[in-house]
């Protein structure tokens, strides 16, 4: 799980990472803890970061470029490999990834499937994190 990330990978995704850093710094200001793991900033909530828990309430964590926001570090430990697949997806698709993710959800819905569970990016993340 220790990928070699290039400067290009960081730059290609940097606009989304900057957006994620906004939430990371806000969470940190309210007591969240930050950890650098495998070239990605992981941020986990604290009792005073209830808004972060609300942001990740439906799903335990969210990836924004090279930033992963989660409810707690224990949760991040459980979902780390899944979220790191999303980081690699960002590195593949760059700033287009959020749009492609939404389009994949819409396509799943149009096919009569679930917007999250049948999203091709989530299917890939579940499969690769289980390997």
Describe each region flagged by the PLM.
Residues 55-80, 91:
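Short pre-active-site segment immediately N-terminal to the catalytic Zn-binding motif
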């Amino acid at each position: 799980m220790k990928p070699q990330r290039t400067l290009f990978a960081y730059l290609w995704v940097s606009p989304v990472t900057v957006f994620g850093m906004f939430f990371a710094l806000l969470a940190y200001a309210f007591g969240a803890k930050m950890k650098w793991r495998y070239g990605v900033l992981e941020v986990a909530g604290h009792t005073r970061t209830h808004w972060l828990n609300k942001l990740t309430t439906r799903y335990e964590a969210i990836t924004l470029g090279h930033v992963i926001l989660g409810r707690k570090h224990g949760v991040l430990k459980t979902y780390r490999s899944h979220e790191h697949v999303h980081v690699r997806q960002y590195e593949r698709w760059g700033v287009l990834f959020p749009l492609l993710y939404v389009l994949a959800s819409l396509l799943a819905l149009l096919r009569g499937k679930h917007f999250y569970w049948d999203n091709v990016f989530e299917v890939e993340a579940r499969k690769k994190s289980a390997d």
